[in-house]
Each structure stands twice: as structure tokens, then as C-alpha cells.
């Protein structure tokens, strides 16, 4: 029984797809356990970029099983589109499995997402308008439609009719918006269900059977710990639990079967959307990092906010996710800077604190306390070991590990598979 969980430790976009793809080489099953198509991940294979939103990164290994777990909310329209995209690129999807217990995103979720966000005015939280939140709301309210329901024509029609009647009343009376048509949604989405039917099964059985047989299972999280609905910067968070604990709920695998948790982070910090960001940069350095790091959202295309590495955030993520290993990405983006900074603590009303406050009001008053290190000018994109890094870059990597309190297993100096350097094999250490 061998399993590894990959989680983002910041606000998403840390490079989880790349690291998952890298670790997938030694896994036999790869599974997603939460989120939806609001999260994008980019994988580079032989110099070619593939952008996925729902399907796990392991899909590029045809001999391995890729699982969309019960904790994922699935937009069938997006899924069918993504499958077609992969097929057009010559990628087989015969190895995909979708949980029959996963909940379905429907057009009324997306419309409600947009209306709710618009109604917030200046208090918007920066949702991707993908219907994720409303779908999880229906799930919690026990009125959601699951994949198993989508495949049953009569049950789907019955539940869609009830839900749509309620949502249309809400659209018309509360938001003064246009109601949606039952027949159009039913026809379109039932057809999507039939297209994905071949992939649908009880994925909890597949995952547990694989673990019981001694196979290596990799769990792939979406977003990041700081977007977790419980542990993140609430309410500027997602509607699910990206933390490692979300694996047990979102995949149907018990906590005793989790061996390692790999936290993925960048050598700096980025964030899409609104919400607290203590180390955010608004100067030329921030603009340089954004451009060199190509910091634009995979899903939204929006420019990401960028800032210095925040070890306070990282220690919070380590604690609430039980991180055992760290993967440090995008070190190359910092090349060319005279100095680099790491936030080691916050100043809150004149008091030094080393924890991440829950209160948004306190966070607004937090000022980062920085440790400044000398930068490096060399191009490090061709580096293939820690010893090949310039001394200042090497010191930066070591200092990150010290401040976070977790050993660094891999570091990356570019987006390619070959640019990921192994310091310690995660699989071998289990």
C-alpha cells in the first residue's frame, strides 16, 4: 500500500500539474479528489503544452488509470470538450474513470454564480464563474444531481425539473433575470452523460483495490491550501477542501492509507482574484516576476497578483495539510534580481507574529517582515542538480526549506519535465 498526495501550498498555480505529471511516472493510478474545471493545470511534454481543467495529469500515461473522484464537481460540457481536445491531440482516454458519486454542474449553477457575484458589487470574491460554488451548495443542501443520476434518463428528468423550477423562481424574482429552458438543458446534458458513460464507475473500489494490491496511487489536488474553504483566506476561497485531508472525503479512501503529502510551491507567491496577500508586490520587481513567470491564469487568462515567498503561509499549509515533502518550483523566474526577499514573519500592530491570522481585519494590518538574500544573475534553466545552482540560488533553496520546516524533495528551473531536479525520491522513501 503506497500513496502520495500532491497539494498546492499557496493560492493555486504553484505547478501541481507539472509535479503530478513528474510523480505519475512511478505511479500506477492517479486521482483527483476535489474542485472542478475552475482549476487549470499545464503539463509540458516534449516541449508541447497541454492545458487541462478536469482530467487528471496522469491521462498522458495510457497504461495508468486516471480517476475523477467523488469529491470533484463535474461540468459534463467541459469534460466532453476536454476529451475531444485530447483525442484531437492523439491522446487516448481509455484509462479514464469517473466516479458515479461525483456531482454535476449544470447551466443554472453557472448562471447563479454570475448573478451572485454581480450582486456583491465591490465585495466580489473573484469567482471564475464556473458554477463550482453553487454546485457544492446544492450538494450540501442534498438537492444535487450526481453522475449516476445524469445517466438515468427518468431520474435526471425528474430531478432537473424540480431543481430548475426552484432556480428559475430565484432568477426571476430575486435577480430579475431570464429563466432557463428545461428541454434544452435536458437534451444537451443527457447526451453528454451518454458520451461519458463508458468511463463511469465506483472509483472508491478502484482506488482501494489498487492500494490493497500494493500499487502506487497518486492523489492530485486542485487550487491550494490557502484557497481551502476551512483553512484558507475565507471568504476569498474555493468551495471545497484542497488540503490533504480532502483526499479521504473526495476519493473514498481512508486516512490510514495515505503515506506521503508533497506540498508544491513556487519560489515566489502568486494569486488570482481578490483576498489578502501580505507580500504582494506593486512595483517593477512584481511586474518583472509576472512577465518572466508568465503569471496569467490557465482558466481565466487574468494577470495573477505576485509577491515574495511567504514562509508564514507555507508553515500554515505545512501544519494543516501534514506536508512531509516540499517541491519548490520556478526558481529560474527569480534569476537576474540583485536581491531576493523571503517573508519570515508579520508585524501586527507592532507585535511580531509567525502565524497566519483568521481575521481579515488583522490580515489587512499585517506587514511582512523580510529576510533579504543576495540574488543571482546566471541562467539556471539548464541546471540538473543542486550543486550546479549558483551559490546564492543554492542558499535560497536551503533557506526556504529551513523556514518552512520541511525537506525539499524536488526543485524546478523551468516548465519541462527534464527541468525538475530530484533531491529525494518521494516514492522510494515510503
From Swiss-Prot:
Ligand binding (GTP): 12-18, 40-42, 304, 330-332, 412-414
SMART domains: Adenylsucc_synt
The keyword Oxidoreductase appears for this protein: no
Cofactor note: Binds 1 Mg(2+) ion per subunit.
Keyword GTP-binding in record: yes
A Gene Ontology cellular-component term: cytoplasm
Active site: 13 (proton acceptor), 41 (proton donor)
Disulfide feature: none
Stored SUPFAM superfamilies: P-loop containing nucleoside triphosphate hydrolases (SSF52540)
Binding sites annotated in the UniProt record for IMP: 13-16, 38-41, 128, 142, 223, 238, 302
GO BP term, example: IMP metabolic process
UniProt: Mg(2+) binding residues: 13, 40
Enzyme Commission designation: 6.3.4.4
Enzyme type, top EC level: ligase
Subcellular location: Cytoplasm
Subunit structure: Homodimer.
Full protein name: Adenylosuccinate synthetase
Organism, as annotated: Streptococcus pyogenes serotype M3 (strain ATCC BAA-595 / MGAS315)
Lineage, opening ranks: Bacteria, Bacillati, Bacillota, Bacilli, Lactobacillales
